[in-house]
Amino acid sequence: MASLIYRQLLANSYAVDLSDEIQSVGSEKNQRVTVNPGPFAQTGYAPVNWGPGEVNDSTVVQPVLDGPYQPASFDLPVGNWMLLAPTGPGVVVEGTDNSGRWLSVILIEPGVTSETRTYTMFGSSKQVLVSNASDTKWKFVEMMKTAVDGDYAEWGTLLSDTKLYGMMKYGERLFIYEGETPNATTKGYIVTNYASVEVRPYSDFYIISRSQESACTEYINNGLPPIQNTRNVVPVAISSRSIEPRRVQANEDIVVSKTSLWKEMQYNRDIIIRFRFDNSIIKSGGLAYKWAEISFKAANYQYNYMKDGEEVTAHTTCSVNGVNDFSFNGGSLPTDFAISRYEVIKENSYVYVDYWDDSQTFRNMVYVRSLAANLNDVMCSGGDYSFALPAGQWPVMKGGAATLHTAGVTLSTQFTDYVSLNSLRFRFRLAVEEPSFTITRTRVSKLYGLPAANPNGGREYYEVAGRFSLISLVPSNDDYQAPIMNSVTVRQDLERRLNELREEFNNLSQEIAVSQLIDLAMLPLDMFSMFSGIEGTVNAPQSMATNVMRKFKSSKLASSVSMLTDSLSDAASSIARSTSIRSIGSAASAWANISEQTQDAVNEVATISSQVSQISGKLRLKEITTPTEGMNFDDISAAVLKAKIDRSIQVDPNALPDVITEASEKFIRNRAYRVIDGDESFEAGTGGRFFANKVETLEEMPFNIEKFADLVTHSPVISAIIDFKTLKNLNDNYGITREQAFNLLRSNPKVLRGFIDPNNPIIKNRIEQLIMQCRL
């Protein structure tokens, strides 16, 4: 009935030969938009528009107009214009070096005939004869004396319709504006001790740097910009310029909010990212004159650097997306040089760099918001690659360059089925640069981009410096670590009783190798995987930290695992496929006697029927039950297991119900099955949920339950490991081919195992940390 199904499952493999067409999907495309994120740097999140978290910037932006400030006596900084904006007639400003110059500037309104007025200048009253013949412009008059008890004399005037006046100390002179607007110009007076000249303004004023003198002259002649003439601009005390600036730390932790159990921490960090490209160069068979492929592949790089006085170990994975395929064919003869395909990244490409280090920031980076980053640009230039021909001069691919500009940052996950590490994925867009790349002794020349032949150009790595900021939700007690959002195995382990976990991990931590932990995590998520998986761990000093494994080891089942696995496979082959899923009119309970529900199937094979009768009343198993619209789907695995258990006579029947019950309820409670028909995929989960999607576009489609039932009867059934939501996230973030989608849909074991690199120090260290957390 379901031989192909269970031969695949019991062999600890999910690969199913769907058709030759599926195997060749994607091979005819000339241009790929895909990404190979490497063996342990997969993204578990879709692209997200994160909030604008605070990022400190060291760039100094000097405004043209600094102010307005309230009138107050102060030491005017050398090389800065003081732009005064009086509102009425009278003394505008006073300045003196207390030795040879006493300057007082008075303002006279338009249309004043010659008259004597009294002004208070430097604390004493003086009578001054003033006049202003202009009917429209205001008149600034500079009154100067050279001795303390001397008389004031008029030194210069400024006729202004903007009512603005300027003064600056620079180059042993005191500069002011004279003439008539809109053609007023500067004039300097030699001052003996100009640096110590103290200025006392009597109106609001602004400070303008000498480098912006042209703007100051523009304001004197034509007036302030409109925004300075609104009621919303309020002058402040000049003492505010003397406030000691707080030096911001490059790396700082800020408590945003805090409760008894949790707190929000903002981490501002500087960062040094080092990465390198990797490539794959494959030669074609024959006379060694032809190359099949030159392509990019994910590259890992580990390094140490000092961050805020602490040495951190960082790990990066560099991958590319949106590659452009080129080719060169020098002729049809076997000795003609040719490259079937070589990849180049250009403006339409992206470079992804996944970054993780062992600092405190990444230990608690689980619940994150307000993620932002500022990074420098980096130029990547290619080197030379010589195509070693058996005879003749060698063609050389040389040149090519591209600049990487930061295009955003998201969370990514470096994970296995046992642990998941949240890391940062920095996304870079490309801009092509000089020089172009060429292949000498061929027609290929003046092409732009970075080819995959030698993308590092002889360098060990490329380096990018910058800063990032994020707000993370962490436990209030710094000794605790935030629970990690892991995949199925870890999540189910955490659901068990804490005391059992501590006891098991205390016993296992020094005796179980990391590779064995990974093997357990990689077990297929179906009931039969326990039988094939226990064979590799039954001789371990301790069980694998689960009650299920302990029960298997303590029972007689461990001694006959191999035979039982073969028996189950044979039994699955013996049952006719036509009854794999049946329409049950009455809502039959999954706890009902399985021998009654599968009697039709059992009767087809007499030997199986005789074995079923021996334990038909003892084994009651809760398996997949998916009720919908009056129809129940019972997983055929229950009948297969029941039919063949009795073939292993030495197995204690009393141990099996406990083992299978706990396995089905706890160890493998999250499960789904999938059937693929052409470009359509149907999926049924244990929770009574159904999905149907298009493989090509990953779009959801209506679920045809009749077609699903027919397909399950006549098609291979695959245990679904990667759900469609994850597939869609991968496609949105990278763009995956139809062939890659099929490999993930059918749970190809090579693809799944590609997620794990046991030699990766990040994963190894994280597993050890997880074990240490569970110790007493």
Swiss-Prot record:
Keyword annotations from UniProtKB, A to Z: Capsid protein, Coiled coil, Disulfide bond, Hemagglutinin, Host cell membrane, Host cytoplasm, Host cytoskeleton, Host endoplasmic reticulum, Host membrane, Host-virus interaction, Membrane, Outer capsid protein, Viral attachment to host cell, Viral penetration into host cytoplasm, Viral penetration via permeabilization of host membrane, Virion, Virus entry into host cell
Residues flagged as site, Cleavage: R231, N232, R241, S242, R247, V248
GO CC, alphabetical: host cell endoplasmic reticulum-Golgi intermediate compartment; host cell plasma membrane; host cell rough endoplasmic reticulum; host cytoskeleton; membrane; viral outer capsid
Motif (KID motif): 644-646
Spike head as annotated region, ranges: 65-224
Entry superkingdom: Viruses
Record motif YGL motif, residues: 448-450
A Pfam family it matches: Rota_VP4_MID
Region span, Spike body and stalk (antigen domain): 248-479
Gene3D superfamilies: 1.20.5.170, 2.60.120.200
S-S bonds: C318-C380
Signal peptide residue numbers: none
UniProt region (Spike foot), positions on chain: 510-776
Entry keyword annotation includes Coiled coil: yes
Coiled coil: 484-518
Gene Ontology biological-process annotations: permeabilization of host organelle membrane involved in viral entry into host cell; virion attachment to host cell
Motif (DGE motif): 308-310
Residue ranges of the region described as Hydrophobic: 389-409
Other observations noted: In group A rotaviruses, VP4 defines the P serotype.
Family: Belongs to the rotavirus VP4 family.
Name of the protein in question: Outer capsid protein VP4
Taxonomic source organism: Rotavirus A (isolate RVA/Cow/United States/VMRI/1988/G6P[5])
Record lineage: Viruses, Riboviria, Orthornavirae, Duplornaviricota, Resentoviricetes
